[in-house]
Amino acid sequence: MSSPSKRREMDLMKLMMSDYKVEMINDGMQEFFVEFSGPKDSIYEGGVWKIRVELPDAYPYKSPSVGFITKIYHPNVDEMSGSVCLDVINQTWSPMFDLVNVFETFLPQLLLYPNPSDPLNGEAAALMMRDRPTYEQRVKEYCEKYAKPRADTEEMSSDDEMSEDEYASDGDDEDDVAIAGKLDP
């Protein structure tokens, strides 16, 4: 195993052993999803985003590619593709950093200190500079609409499944029989 390959494996294991939920995309160790929570005491607090990470062949000498799968309203994140302004990580990346640094330092810094002068989302950048309270409200609306904590979304889906099961097997069956009886000639 080559040195970059060993390093990739070690960094990925370290990330998996941390508090972050990691979901591999393929059998390899190059692409995966990570759940990332908004920094405390920020307008992003309470939000949980699914982040796609791609490790280049030259990792750790070249920075990972990071993109938001979950929608986020931020000047340095493209709203449609989820791409993060590459300068955020590339300019400061060093092989001394690892994947945990991306989620404990780089992304929190990105959310805490947006740079509206180098935007990927021009609308968010303009709103942030023109009307900060409205910008912050929009961020919170996106958090509420798209970045609900995973536990809440799991509960909602299991409730939805339960209501479908109830519809198919419980009291609604009696209604179905009654309706079917009324419709028969």
Curated annotation (Swiss-Prot):
GO molecular function, one term: ubiquitin conjugating enzyme activity
GO terms classed as biological process: protein ubiquitination; ubiquitin-dependent protein catabolic process
Annotated catalysed reactions: S-ubiquitinyl-[E1 ubiquitin-activating enzyme]-L-cysteine + [E2 ubiquitin-conjugating enzyme]-L-cysteine = [E1 ubiquitin-activating enzyme]-L-cysteine + S-ubiquitinyl-[E2 ubiquitin-conjugating enzyme]-L-cysteine
Keywords: ATP-binding, Nucleotide-binding, Transferase, Ubl conjugation pathway
Acidic residues: compositionally biased ranges: 154-177
Induction trigger: Not induced by heat shock.
Tissue: Expressed in developing ovules, but not in vascular tissues.
The keyword ATP-binding is assigned to this record: yes
Residues of the active site: C85 (glycyl thioester intermediate)
Protein name per its UniProtKB record: Ubiquitin-conjugating enzyme E2 5
A Pfam family the protein falls into: UQ_con
Broad enzyme group: transferase
Lineage: Eukaryota, Viridiplantae, Streptophyta, Embryophyta, Tracheophyta
Organism, scientific name: Arabidopsis thaliana (Mouse-ear cress)
Function of the protein: Accepts the ubiquitin from the E1 complex and catalyzes its covalent attachment to other proteins.
Family note: Belongs to the ubiquitin-conjugating enzyme family.
Residues covered by region (Disordered): 146-185
Residue ranges annotated for the UBC core domain, each copy included: 1-148
EC number: 2.3.2.23
InterPro entries noted in UniProt: UBQ-conjugat_E2_core, UBQ-conjugating_AS, UBQ-conjugating_enzyme/RWD
Entry keyword annotation includes ATP-binding: yes
Pathway listed: Protein modification; protein ubiquitination
